[in-house]
């Protein structure tokens, strides 16, 4: 893919994000910032489309979140100038684990724990 093609894709994404926000009355966006590549790209796109002052991010950590992920997420926010906050969702995950253990009579397995974390992050962002 050429630079020109990549720029065209980027500009289309930027225009569509701005248009979607305008059409739905959203002046600001809230996104999850994990310290990974996907959320880094989304945050840069949002800043480019809306301006950093309209981008807000949450790093929703659990007991499994590495210090490196926290550092990278903070660096991404600082470099791009958007609002950023770390919140600990582990207490919510722990409550869900206890609830599920009561329902099913055993502790949740690894894949279930991963899904709980992903769903809690999604619920938090949709709230």
Segments the model singles out, each with a brief description of its role:
Residues 2-9, 65, 112-117:
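Conserved acidic
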Residues 27-33, 37-74:
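ATP-dependent adenylation/pyrophosphate-handling site
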Residues 54, 59, 67-112, 116-118:
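A conserved beta-strand->alpha-helix junction
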């Amino acid at each position: 893919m050429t630079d020109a093609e990549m720029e065209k894709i980027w500009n289309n994404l930027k225009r569509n994000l701005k248009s979607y926000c305008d059409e739905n009355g959203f002046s600001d966006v809230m996104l999850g910032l994990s310290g990974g590549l996907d959320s880094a790209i989304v945050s840069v796109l949002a800043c480019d489309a809306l301006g950093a002052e309209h981008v807000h991010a949450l790093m929703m950590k659990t007991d499994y979140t590495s210090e490196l992920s926290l550092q990278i997420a903070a660096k991404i926010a600082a470099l791009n100038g958007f609002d950023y906050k770390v919140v600990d969702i582990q207490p919510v995950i722990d409550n869900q684990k206890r609830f599920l253990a009561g329902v099913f009579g055993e502790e949740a397995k690894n894949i279930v724990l991963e899904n709980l974390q992903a769903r809690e992050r999604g619920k938090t962002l949709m709230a």
